[in-house]
Amino acid sequence: MTERAVPTIPGFTAGYVDVAGLPTWHEVHGQGPAVVLLHGGFSGAAAWSAQAPALAGAGFRVHVPERRGHAHTPDVAGPLSYDVMAGDTIAYLEAVLGDRPAHLAGWSDGAVVALLVAQRRPDLAARLVLIGQYYHSAGRAAGRDLDQWLRSAAARDFLRQGYDPFSPDGPGHFPVVYDKTLAMIESEPELDLATFGTVTAPTLVLQGDRDVVTLEHSAAVAAALPDARLAVLPGSHALPLELPGVVNPLLISFLRGAVATPASAPGFLSNG
């Protein structure tokens, strides 16, 4: 099984933890208040490779779990849904942190999962960061064009490169995960923002101005949550990968309890 190189960080570990019977791969970096980073679809811990060391270096204990059917974590029979992934994440938090709250940061599908976790279990979410999130399919800028691309042979071959070297289920299982993930993306999430009034965690909604999510959609999320602000970074769409030099100080500042300002993360637009 191919492993990716990671920086040498005091307190770094990687391996499997039992989560309600599912062997779940995770990385743990550093020491301090807990931050849990939730990756997007067809991805894994590597998506946060520019953030985990920076957050650990800033004094956080960073947990990066990989969800069922992603990277090192095996698949589970049955359909995939955001509801299922939120349940898995709650079980992970309980298994690893007990009843202690953690800061949750999610990107793309991971942001949807983080939002659902904070809705269901506000006691587990200290602060919340939603990057490139979408609570409804209408908010995706690319819409059905993205769905069609994901069904293309080129997309399938590209996504397979991030699955085959890592999955304990073997490369032959990729078509199963591919089909169930696309079935989920094409029909979910269709969430009602009016139901998220229970999200009590201070929230940062973050996106690029060229993101797959419309600005209006993210503004609606920030307006609907009880304690949220929106930050838009110019000239980018895959923020954690493209702009870590801006994203990382912004995350650190927010997770430490400060309201993000242009001084703490230059080059972004914010609604305060």
PLM feature segments, named:
Residues 112-120, 124-158:
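Flexible "cap/lid" loop of the alpha/beta hydrolase fold
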Residues 9, 49-52, 57, 63-105:
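Active-site loop/oxyanion-hole signature of alpha/beta-hydrolase fold enzymes
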Residues 228-229, 233-272:
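Catalytic active-site module of serine/aspartate enzymes centered on a nucleophile-bearing elbow/loop
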Residues 179-195:
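Active-site nucleophile elbow and catalytic-triad environment of alpha/beta-hydrolase enzymes
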Residues 198-199, 205-207:
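Short beta-strand/loop motif that positions the catalytic acidic residue
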Residues 212-217:
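Conserved alpha/beta-hydrolase "acid-adjacent" motif
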Residues 18, 22-74:
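Conserved HGGG/HGGXW glycine-rich cap/lid loop of the alpha/beta-hydrolase fold
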Residues 1-35, 57-60, 256-272:
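Alpha/beta-hydrolase fold catalytic core
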